Amino acid sequence: LNLTIDGVTTAVDYVNNSYYLPIDMDAVQPAKVKVEFGGIGVDFIKIGDKKIKSGENIALSLNPGQNIEMEAGNNTIDKIRSCRLIVTGVPVIELSAPEGIEDENKRPCDIVLTDPKRRTNNSVLRFESYAGIEFRGAGALRYAKKSFSFKLKNRQTNENQDAKLLGLREDQSWILDAMWLDCSKMRNRVCFDLWNDFNTLYYSNTEPEAVNTTHGYPVEMILDGAYHGLYILSDRIDRKQLKLKKKGGYLYKGKEWTDECKLQGINTPYSNSKQAWQGFESDYPNEVGEIEFKYLSDLIQFFAAASKEEFAAQYEERLDVSSLIDYFIFINLLSAYDNTGRNVFWGIYNVNLTLLPKFIIQPWDLDGTLGRTWDAIKLRS
């Protein structure tokens, strides 16, 4: 059964015989909707006691969270198939990955994103694209519900292709966050949105389009014909988002609880021959020959070994103090203990502007906040 309601093609969960219909919660829903369908041997569908023919306008009240029981039938064969229409107030994304999905190796994928608000590429209701998809997050791979990252591509040339999904930035790379450990399904997104409102990049007058973290929206996800749950579709925090300079900009990501990530000292001298060093990853640049950990190493050494006099004389040159103060207040308000060494970005807007590189600090992975630890244990008040 292929089912369309008022021009919106429903997404099918074949495992549970369910049809997902996204509606715009901010719009007034019509009193009547046009029901269109097709399928082998399907002559009518039945909602309640009413038989409906394809193309018929019917009175149907649609509200988010509704589960409407339906039956699909044939006029000559006495056989009825039960199914459900599920109304959701968020967009629906459908992924089809016929070759499977792996870690750190993008596999072919087809994507369909249906947004009743038509925010994609400014007006598109149903966006379809070819893509490469992979699992995302090393620790999260052990969970049943996995996160994904995907890159939009041209099917014929396999070249990367930009799109403006859900009205977010125009880009090729996107994240689907599973929020597996967060029962509220909101911590990461709400905290990022708070940081967006909380903090202003010191160079924002020069770069008015710079954004200090991600933006995203909830979506219902169907993977290979089976409902997979609620996700957050978001853009990425990277050089492009922060508007760091291509020549002179640097972005480092703290991923472990090393002394280096905690700015407590250097146990192993840096090397630019790899993307990773002592729990840090060079997010930008990420090509050997362009990677430079010297600036980060100098910052760690400054924090760990500078005298009081040296620190007082140089800290305003080395750090965007406003950013650091905002970060200190932010992580304490949220009880973000998992963001005090790892899950932190350190960035440089342009190393060529000042005698000493000036660092900004940005949070990442904020699901261990607001009364929960990184592994979902409730904090004592």
Which residue stretches match the model-derived regions?
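Predominantly extracytoplasmic/ectodomain segments of secreted and cell-surface proteins
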Residues: L1-N63, T76-C83
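Conserved NTP-binding catalytic cores of kinases and kinase-like/nucleotidyltransferase enzymes
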Residues: M25-V28, K34, G38-G39, T76-V190
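Extracellular Ig-like/FN3 beta-sandwich strand-entry sites
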Residues: N63-N67, K106
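Conserved structural position at the C-terminal beta-strand
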Residues: M70-A72
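Active-site acidic catalytic loop and adjacent metal/ATP-binding pocket
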Residues: F150, E317-T373
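Internal "kinase-insert"/substrate-recognition segments embedded within catalytic cores
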Residues: N154-N158, K164, L168-L181, N212, ...
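A conserved alpha-helical element in kinase catalytic cores
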Residues: D182-S204
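Surface-exposed patches in mature extracellular/periplasmic domains of secreted proteins
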Residues: L201-V219, F311-Y315
